[in-house]
UniProtKB/Swiss-Prot annotation:
GO terms for cellular component: membrane. This is Respiratory burst oxidase homolog protein A. Keywords: Calcium, FAD, Flavoprotein, Membrane, Metal-binding, NADP, Oxidoreductase, Peroxidase, Phosphoprotein, Repeat, Transmembrane, Transmembrane helix. Residues 366-380, 450-484, 551-709 are extracellular. Signal peptide: none annotated. The modification Phosphoserine is found at residues 311, 315. Calcium-dependent NADPH oxidase that generates superoxide. CDD domains: EFh, NOX_Duox_like_FAD_NADP. Ca(2+) binds at residues 234, 236, 238, 240, 245. Residues 63-87, 107-130, 738-760 are annotated as: Disordered. It comes from Arabidopsis thaliana. Residues 383-540 form the Ferric oxidoreductase domain. Its EC number is 1.11.1.-, 1.6.3.-.
Amino acid sequence: MMNRSEMQKLGFEHVRYYTESPYNRGESSANVATTSNYYGEDEPYVEITLDIHDDSVSVYGLKSPNHRGAGSNYEDQSLLRQGRSGRSNSVLKRLASSVSTGITRVASSVSSSSARKPPRPQLAKLRRSKSRAELALKGLKFITKTDGVTGWPEVEKRFYVMTMTTNGLLHRSRFGECIGMKSTEFALALFDALARRENVSGDSININELKEFWKQITDQDFDSRLRTFFAMVDKDSDGRLNEAEVREIITLSASANELDNIRRQADEYAALIMEELDPYHYGYIMIENLEILLLQAPMQDVRDGEGKKLSKMLSQNLMVPQSRNLGARFCRGMKYFLFDNWKRVWVMALWIGAMAGLFTWKFMEYRKRSAYEVMGVCVCIAKGAAETLKLNMAMILLPVCRNTITWLRTKTKLSAIVPFDDSLNFHKVIAIGISVGVGIHATSHLACDFPRLIAADEDQYEPMEKYFGPQTKRYLDFVQSVEGVTGIGMVVLMTIAFTLATTWFRRNKLNLPGPLKKITGFNAFWYSHHLFVIVYSLLVVHGFYVYLIIEPWYKKTTWMYLMVPVVLYLCERLIRAFRSSVEAVSVLKVAVLPGNVLSLHLSRPSNFRYKSGQYMYLNCSAVSTLEWHPFSITSAPGDDYLSVHIRVLGDWTKQLRSLFSEVCKPRPPDEHRLNRADSKHWDYIPDFPRILIDGPYGAPAQDYKKFEVVLLVGLGIGATPMISIVSDIINNLKGVEEGSNRRQSPIHNMVTPPVSPSRKSETFRTKRAYFYWVTREQGSFDWFKNVMDEVTETDRKNVIELHNYCTSVYEEGDARSALITMLQSLNHAKHGVDVVSGTRVMSHFARPNWRSVFKRIAVNHPKTRVGVFYCGAAGLVKELRHLSLDFSHKTSTKFIFHKENF
């Protein structure tokens, strides 16, 4: 301790010692203050904070509590950092040397004090180092990128517009709107906090006060922002938070992050924080203690797996310098394109080549006929386009023969060279080819051939008389012929079907008036596509009465093109009708889940064999007898039931949910009906709507077993096929573990049955699976809660790495989500449950940094083929595909991207 004369030289009378040890630093709980109080409390003193760790002690802080001015505060953070590194100023050096003799006494005092008090409960897995805390301090933000960062000129402009009728005063209720903040509740609390800090009274502010408020909001200094945040709940400014204020801060954060479950459980979580920071039941906690808990690093339930050096090397490899030679850049780009798309390239080349060959053949054939002398090149073009139309009208049916494609991709090796994943896209490309062909064919006839026939003289027309009959001068006679009527009819019907099949109409993206809106959507697309029954009938008739051909019907080629595809497609439809009606399925369980999702558990027919990632069609005759809708199967192949999760969006799904919701409603007490739609607990068999299924059908995600490492990405309801894959991996892990246990048993060692070749081919290959599920609603995590918990219980070898992202929560590092992050770590450490998802899997906030995700996988798995499987909205497809190609080109890891048609 300093003697009195030494203290007087510095201008102070007493010294108060505060110690920091591993017990009270960020590695455990709140600070513990040990006071050496040799004189009266009213006399001046100096506070010295000592950092005691094992046998080492260092000065951590120095200040005069009785002198709060800027000149008397020695606890500047930069000064302390210098002091700890040997670069302190003279005052700190003198104090450090003077107190060195009292360090041992203080340390022993702290140890004895700690021994007398009951130890605070230690939370396993809650750890932070000072470096991580400093990073958190620098990165913590108060306002997100979308709230309040529009810039002062915009805020000022809005202020003047909003205060035109209020004499230049902005009311408290419109403060959030003025600064561009969406959360009204958060904006009101922010206004009150800033008003207290700036000593502003009343519920209105002028432009100068708003500018001061704006400076506080946009201040990049962490301390200022954190003080503002705590001022929002510490309304009496005493530096203490009681349980009610802690509850308010939790409610405030939950409201800003749209987390209704946390808001409803605010009392429980407030009690949890008080239990941690107020073990002696003083009834309050200090704000600085809550700051320590806020800075706890979120627990990581996964291993990073890469070092800084590897990460740096990879970053350097990804920065490929651009060649100045345009030829070299073009060649490299073409090389990458062919390498990534060679399956699509050869299929498209074959298709385009076939069309070009047919067009050229017919063009040259009619170039030599007498019709060329009358109608010229127009008839050659019309007949060439007609031949391509025959091919395309036949081929467009093949990509939608789902049973055939499923059999080919599952039972044959053709998937190695044929891009079955692009079957629907190829269907659309052929439709475009048909549109172009129809345009050329119809225009050539209507705008060129018919006018030339009318204008031809008798000698020119004579060779055409055997095809068209006596010459007519009326244009309408050609249009009203069988060929003309059937052709125009096909064009009209195809135009309707093609238009309603476009994304704008099929997904109701156009803002149409009420009456017109009813003729758009999936139902309009579904029913309009059935017009092709009429189209193909007209096509056969049109081909029978085709112009310029008078041979018998069996020598005409239209029916030859169509016969095989049409018969194949009709067989597909018959198989669907037969398969769905032979063995009916019963509903085992129904649940209406948060986020407008209907979960159905159905009995599994004995002959229904499928793979994870595949889908099936559902039909509910109570809604519509004709409509069949595809849904991914969420159960695993090893389960004894079938499950689907249906997002309620369109008319059909809304009616389906309404029907099942009626079944789930509780009956009056006298009817003795249990309030749950689970057949295992029913007192009687409920009257569920009849469900028919058809499938399974192949999908891109079913190929996950071809890869040892897979990256599964699901957006919202797009997680459904990925959940089936995760469940399948769990079942396989259980099977491998059970097999290992059997081999280790003495009985198994006595008799070991041989493994068949088929069993060897089905060996489980997946060694690592990364699952990223991104959803906006917190309630979405309830959909697959059981699966998430099962992963944490079963996956002892860490094969599956789960990442749940809730985008409604502000990004990590924002003050409004800092409370959620702290609460998340605290609750998970104590109860093993994540407060956001309600599962044992820790959730992340905002959206993933996909480049970092790919970078991490590339570092962890060099020279490996990684299967990337995505299902969700189309907005993310481009980014994931680009990253897959980019990392495949620039690293030794090859990412193979698969997109589910969603």
